[in-house]
Amino acid sequence: TKCPTCQNDTCSNKI
């Protein structure tokens, strides 16, 4: 599960 356009380092799959 990757995030749609993650701007922060909170998600593992940041864009």
From Swiss-Prot:
Q: Keywords for this entry?
A: Secreted
Q: Where does it primarily localize? A: secreted
State the tissue distribution. Expressed by the venom gland.
Can you say where in the cell this protein is located?
Secreted
GO cellular-component term (any): extracellular region
UniProt KW Secreted keyword: yes
Top-level taxonomic group: Eukaryota
Entry protein name:
Peptide 7629
